[in-house]
Amino acid sequence: MGIVYRANTSADVNITVPRSGTTHRAIVVFPGYIMPGGTLGRAFAPYVADDDALVVVNYAERGVNVSQIYAKVMEALHKLRPVELRVYGASMGGMVAKLFLDQYRQAGAPYGKIILILDSAPVSRNNVKRPAFLFDVSCWCRGGPLSSAVWAAASQFGPKPPTEDDASQEIVREARHAGAWIGMPAATSQGCFIAKFGVLKEGELLDVAQQVVFLQGSSPDDDPLIRISDAISGWRTAFPNLMVITVQGRNARWHLPLVEYPRETVRAMIATRS
């Protein structure tokens, strides 16, 4: 079925302009693969500062084209003209953020050194609590409508994380529905991308980032998907002075409940000052 199944291969970005009308800081958000960018942008928007702009990446249904993503993000930043740039990568999005910064460096870092926030982000397939063979399979198993329907059915079961009191329940429902119906092409694209992610070089983020922060939920060892301590050690290779912040109101047993805890997440995201 996967051989004849077609999926969208174009990424795009969702832009939230500052409430003040003038951009001081732009926050580029790289979510995990199954989180729709527009939905996450709506969840985060009420909690950023009045002069903050959000540029949230919405991945293609199949494949991660970093050059395409870079071009879309930079086009958005050119329109916003920020003074300060902050980059946030959640789960697999941290890896995408790193590759984005590789191209940003090659372009001469047009907005200067950035602040990079990594939220429960792996740095290699070994940081992910899944059998290794699944990553290899994901690079040749494309997925199709039948496997996507099975994914959606399976996603309906199991406990769901609680939410903050002021989290939009409409946005939560929308994000969960989108995650359930994201489809196997997206799931296999995510696995293959992680499988092919290269080893970090010592100190390689020092010339492009003024600060790197790693966010983790409380009880980080309980994260069901990521070996958090191993991931932190891996990112420290690229930025030795990496800072770790625990989001106390967000239990790690849910991995990344971003739309369920937008206020706590954004508060941690913007807490570090440049």
What do the PLM-derived regions correspond to, one by one?
Residues 2-51:
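Short, surface-exposed "cap/lid" segments of acyl-processing enzymes
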Residues 59-62, 114-129:
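Active-site nucleophile loop of the alpha/beta-hydrolase fold
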Residues 68-85:
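Conserved acidic catalytic loop of the alpha/beta-hydrolase fold
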Residues 129-174:
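Helix-rich cap/lid subdomain of alpha/beta-hydrolase
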Residues 240-274:
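Catalytic active-site module of serine/aspartate enzymes centered on a nucleophile-bearing elbow/loop
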Residues 159-244:
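Serine-hydrolase catalytic core
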Residues 88-97:
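Gly/Ala-rich beta-loop-alpha elbow adjacent to hydrolase catalytic centers
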Residues 46-64:
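Conserved alpha/beta-hydrolase
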